[in-house]
Amino acid sequence: LRVSAAVALCLPASCVALAVATVALSEKSKPVEPPAPKVCGVVSGVMYEFSSEYVPFWPEYEDEGSYKRGSGGVDRGCESNLYSLSLAMNWPELTPGNYFSETFSGIVVTLEPWAAGERGLRETFDFFVSEATYKQREASVFDRQLGLNRVEGVDSVFPNSPRMIFWSERNGHMEQIGRCSWSKYRSKYHRCHFRYLLEDSKAIVKIDFGWDELSEWGEIASRVKIFLASNGIQG
């Protein structure tokens, strides 16, 4: 009644402002609907479905313009083609991780369609290794623990920040590539970004994890493959 009386007694200009404020307060008091319990979509012909607890960002869909991707707010069916979907997981449990927590130290898995196939993966590797000089490339070594080739390069933008580059090939076929970045603040390597193609080479898996988990990369890659397969339905 007090709000109604105030509206009745106010001047025209102030009435508008008061009415808007009243509506805003009433809208704010409405309960926020919880997100859908599942996030689903199709990547390269395979339908995937995950608990929304894994998904820290809005999924991006192929039929959205680049300026709309990841903006969310649209209810999508599971038949919609995904452009990119990221999952935050605790390691080694692979349970949903709280990506926005300051204590989050898990892995982030991104699944995307990949029309470029092995050629595209090799081109990305060429870009990574271009940060190493010819002399550094000649000094590359095979890391037996990881089962990967390794070479140290330098960030092209920040010369004082080294980069560790990893890759593996089989019969001339690029299987996986990775790069770990140096943290000047911590004075050590900090985060790693690896990627590999799924068996049909039509989808790519990108995994970000901490430097301290590098020795477990083989297990990370293997278990993530199993996790994705268990949540995918072949179309």
Residue ranges and their predicted role:
Residues K202-G235:
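Surface-exposed amphipathic alpha-helical segments
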Residues V46, S84, K184-K188, L198:
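Secreted/processed peptides and extracellular or luminal domains of membrane proteins
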Residues L1-A13:
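N-terminal Sec-pathway targeting helices
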Residues A139-K188:
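Signature of long, low-cysteine stretches enriched in small and polar/charged residues
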Residues H190-K206:
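Extended hydrophobic
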Residues P37-V43, F166, F194-L198:
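Short acidic-hydrophobic surface loop/beta-edge motif
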Residues V20-R144:
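Charge-rich, low-complexity N-terminal segments
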